[in-house]
Amino acid sequence: KYGKSLSKVVENLKLAQAYAEDEKQQEVIGKLIEYYETGDLHTFDEYTIAWVENTAPMVDFVNGFTESYGDPLGMKASWESIVNFKDTEATKRTEKLSANAQWFEDNSPVAAEFKKENVKGITAKVIKAAILGGDLYPSTAIGINLPNSNWVRAEHGSKSVTIANLTHAYAESSNGNGMLDE
């Protein structure tokens, strides 16, 4: 059902590899291409780990069957993609919060059995969306916290982002109902 569309995604990912910021980002894109070409879930895990551990790029992306919001059982995910770039000034402010994640975990108003003793690998940054695709289009949440895989999060951490230009757009759109007072 998705073969023709995913072939175009792979074609464009191969083109994008030439513009990767570094070898690590080329590896991430390569693993995603390999996953799309094989459908191998082990390769998807390798891609996810490489993606979550690649925290340096100014330009990043999410691409794949990521969120399962539309499936009540949480088993079937829909395809989505976002290409984004880092807002460096806003990220500096967010990194202060990220650096104190353990304090926030320890002092959160949550029952002790749900708290993590050792918060690991939280990479928080502020981004600006350049393009949205799939289930993210035409609008998306104001933040992303991935991967969804609990074992990957526990062993390799997660990426947590706030999408600044969408947050701003949603705030602006809430200032009125769109009608002129005449």
Locate each region found by the language model.
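Fold-level signature of zinc-dependent metallopeptidase catalytic domains
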Residues: 1-182
